[in-house]
Amino acid sequence: MAEPVYRRVVVKLSGEYLAGPHSFGIDQPTVDRIADDLIAVQKLGIEIAVVVGGGNMVRGVEVSSQGVSRATGDTMGMLATVMNSLALEAALQRKGAPAVALSAFVMPQVCELFTRAAAHRALAEGRIVVLGGGTGNPYFTTDTTAVLRAAEIGAQAVLKATNVDGVYSADPKKDPAAKRFDRLTHSQAIEGGYKVMDATAFALARETSLPIIVFSIAEPGAIGAMLRGEGRGTIVAG
């Protein structure tokens, strides 16, 4: 078995993926499978923080299109990510894994507040850190949150888990001629307008010299495979 490429990473999970085969809510078998994957990665000696999206509950942009202000819609979406983080924390703990949910919002009755010190301490204690609440500010995506938190906690890479095995020149589900890239620079990802992450996330990763690895999480063990350098995906770096 190959040695892990990185020792501390941030994994970005979409809220939509947590819904599993459903269009809304949390699919427990899917959450349990992700928890198993994260536990297996931790056993490789890798420190893991996970940023979860909220699209299975609320998407701020969609809510704002229905008359709610964008700032309010985004706040609703960020609160949805807290619910998802609690679901993942519970699944990990139920399987015997040390895990803690940290929120960008102050909600002491629900979970701990994210601070750099709290995250560093939890990782040093061997806990899987699940990050909810986005950045705590509207207008920023959870992709940008993942890069921001990675920079804050000194992670070596961001793993963007998606439903496709990398970055393509076009949507491979719609265009059979779409080309998959093995590697892109941050600037190429921004200039290409690839929709796998937003430009702000790529720009922050470029500024902080953080590689982003885009891969499919569809198969069990995909996160570990990518971290051992054995998986199929796109590396965005440089």
Swiss-Prot record:
Q: Which domain of life is it from?
A: Bacteria
Pathway in which the depicted protein is active: Pyrimidine metabolism; CTP biosynthesis via de novo pathway; UDP from UMP (UMPK route): step 1/1
Catalysis: reaction(s): UMP + ATP = UDP + ADP
Where is it located?
A: Cytoplasm
What does the subunit section of this Swiss-Prot or TrEMBL entry state? Homohexamer.
| Gene Ontology CC terms | cytosol
Enzyme's top EC category:
transferase
MF annotations from Gene Ontology: ATP binding; UMP kinase activity
Which PANTHER family does the annotation name?
A: URIDYLATE KINASE (PTHR42833), URIDYLATE KINASE PUMPKIN, CHLOROPLASTIC (PTHR42833:SF4)
Q: Which CDD domains does this entry report, sorted A to Z? A: AAK_UMPK-PyrH-Ec
| Keywords per UniProt | ATP-binding, Cytoplasm, Kinase, Nucleotide-binding, Pyrimidine biosynthesis, Transferase
At the highest ranks, the source species' classification is:
Bacteria, Pseudomonadati, Pseudomonadota, Alphaproteobacteria, Hyphomicrobiales
Q: How is its activity regulated?
A: Inhibited by UTP.
Q: Provide the residue positions that the database annotates as binding ATP.
A: 12-15, 55, 59, 162-163, 168, 171
Which residues does the annotation say bind UMP?
Answer: 54, 74, 135-142
For biological process, the GO terms are: 'de novo' CTP biosynthetic process; UDP biosynthetic process
**Mind telling me what this protein is named?**
Uridylate kinase
Q: Which InterPro entries match?
A: AceGlu_kinase-like_sf (IPR036393), Asp/Glu/Uridylate_kinase (IPR001048), Uridylate_kinase (IPR011817), Uridylate_kinase_bac (IPR015963)
| Gene behind this protein | pyrH
